Amino acid sequence: MIFGLLYGLGLRVGEVSRLCRKDVDLDKAVLLIRQTKFGKDRLVPFGPRIALAISSFIERRESGLGPIPPDCPVFSFAKDKQKRIRPTTISWTFHKLLPELKLVIPAGVAQPHLHCLRHSFAVGTLLRWYRAGINPATRLLDLSTFLGHVSPSSTAVYLTITTELFECASQRFAQFAAATLKEVVR
């Protein structure tokens, strides 16, 4: 569930670690992310698949440990419901699980780190916009706000070009260039 929130919503590991039960509103399908990296709070909406996953996780946890009090962390250790799972523990677990994925990492390329899930969310969002015919430039401020960045320039750092993203951007540019060229020739 933790990795699903990191990848599926582009949350920072500390934000997931600090989530309390009162921060999860399943009826409104929104998370309240408190005291982000820049000391602000933000609301992060989520869709039906993530809603189902969160709901199922909370139900399973409560069936084993009892109700989660509002101020208790969503992700805690079984022995102590008050003790949240620390970001370092989440990162350590991620690195322990990496070999299970059997990723082929080319020589000279660094092994993925936990924050790559956030980068993947940002790039995936751009890809979805391209495929839906949405101009990403008009929505970059939305993505920046969603990720809790102070400006779109902070978000741009996350937007690593991938082959798939390059192909989508190239197709969009080719369409733009063809339309512009037709008007110039007239």
Q: What is the predicted function of each stretch?
A:
Residues 1-186:
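Conserved catalytic core of the tyrosine transesterase superfamily
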